[in-house]
Amino acid sequence: MSASSDSAKLAGLNKLIISYPQSKLVGDAYGAQFSVLMSLHRDSAAFFAAHNYLAAKDSQSLPGALHNVAMELAFRRQYPDSALILVDSAISLYREKHGRLAPVLLHTRAMSLFLLKRFAEAELTQREAITLLPASAIFDPRYSNYFAQLGMIQLETHPGVEGLEQYVHASFISSQPSVEYANLDSLFHSRVKDSTSVVRVRDSLFERTANEYLHNFTDTSRAKSFIAESFSRNRVFTGRALQFAREAYREAAMRSLQERCDAAASLGIVLSNAGHNGEAEKFLVEALQTALPSATELFLALGSVQESLGKKNEAFTTYLAGVVVSRPSVLMKPLQALQKELYPHASIDSMITVALRRWVDFFPEKYQRPDSLDGQPNQKTVLAELFTGSECRPCQAADIAYNKLLERYDRAELAVLEYHLHIPRPDPMANTDTELRSEYYGVNSTPTSIIDGTNVINSGGLGIAARAKFAVYADAVDHSLTTPAKASVKISAKILRSKVSFVVSASVTNARKSYKLRVVLAEDGIRYQGANGISEHRFVVRKMIRGAGGTSFNQNGKVTVKDAFAVSTIEDQLENYLTTYEEKMQKPGTLFKEKKSEIDPKQLYIVAFVQDDATHRILESTIVKVKR
């Protein structure tokens, strides 16, 4: 950050403190002020801000605040004695409150001890911090700095290569090495007496770490991609890096789109590091299908490759896509340089705003049945089920993506059902059957998407991630559409004077006891806006007719479900469920801002599907609009 931007930030913080002295934010404003003042080397003013920051904290938040100040001092390598006093106070308060230690507190303490040249004590403290990390931390990039710091300390306490082993380990697992261990060659030359042995010793340590990593993961394809990127980034075994990356890409060919794109990104990055820019571009572009704006390394690699190939406009678009949420300097710098050359009179902020809209407002292509499937009997209708919640912010991307699926596919190709759940807070479109259906699949988080009963796709995101989620969902649907239907389902449904009547008949060959026909009443286009900002909800499950358990087939592999009911009956059931739920939560009449029990008869659909309860596989599904 530049001195001018630091000064501007400082002015803004001062204004907040002066204008709103009673605000709860004032304490944190002093904390931010402390950090900025330290970067400006205004130490006296910084310590005054730190004092006010700590004074504003209650007993609950004081340990964290003490640690924040200590960490700022220690990792700026300033005032280590003060840092040690502060972090020791934080440790004492934290242990008193929680009865245990936190690894991050010990990590900061070890750094303070190191700066005070109390190396033996620093090593013991850092080792203790590492023992408190999760078991998976040894190969988790988020914890690489713990191993790097141990290596830094050991270089002072051990004459051999023990410290180098920790540096290599940290450099291997980290996606973005810190300054502490970026230049390994100079460290090896300072420790290995025989200069001719430097490369051999360095490579042997990397190879050993890679072998340990490979043996710790059952998914060898993903492991190979990780190792390939690490070797390439650290400039060791470049030939083997390319070999591993290509193998991982081939092995991912039959996996999900997300896995294929991850492998393509790794291969593209390795190729670009090796100077094979033409080939690298192909794989990096492929990886964009599921990329989020936070994929800085991918956008940087692709933009750099495109610039090297003389494709400046494409490079500009690539860099622009990577700065729509945050503005990482590694992307902003080349973006601004290209903007001055290509669009000198345009506003970079306006261009970023337009680029941001493209992440959410995209237009999917209509599905085209592959020629290879022509003549295939029993074309299938895929069922996509989404477990979501109107109060679930991470469900935003999944909800938008499902709406885009409905644009891509006709209802003869895809049926959609959305089950609303009380996650993380009460949802007025939830009901008994949506809860039972979530129990059937073992769903305990939202969003969860399930394609044809067996392809479970978890994780969500805000609207900015909708395009990537859509690509993953559409790939799964496309794949399911290549398999023929294993059952026949026919529906006739009508509504007369607010009474729905329907007949569903289904047949299968080689019927099993585990085969069930399930019939669902869904309502399209419910208007309601919860915390996730989605205002229209598509194909919401209102009732599973004959229960969530479904209906069994007879010995001849046939089943018919015939029923009639008043819409008001379903509305009463939904209203009673919501009222009972409020009472259960001891908030009668106040839990929901609006009870969405009223049904629009013009927007009703019957969805029926045959499912194998032994495997959850859906053999066929059908959707029809209830005719008036």
What are these regions (language model features)?
Residues 16-28, 56-62, 77, 93-101, ...:
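Short solvent-exposed coil/turn linkers within tandem alpha-helical repeat scaffolds
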Residues 37, 73-74, 113, 154, ...:
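Residue at a conserved register position within TPR or TPR-like alpha-solenoid repeats
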Residues 3, 40, 76-77, 116, ...:
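Structural motif corresponding to the intra-repeat A-B loop/turn of tetratricopeptide repeats
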Residues 33, 69, 109, 143, ...:
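Structural register within alpha-helical repeat arrays
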Residues 374-414, 419:
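Local sequence-structure signature of Cys/Sec-based thiol-disulfide redox active-site neighborhoods
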Residues 6, 43-44, 80, 119, ...:
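TPR-repeat structural position
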Residues 419-628:
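Short, conserved sequence motifs used for protein processing/export or organelle targeting and
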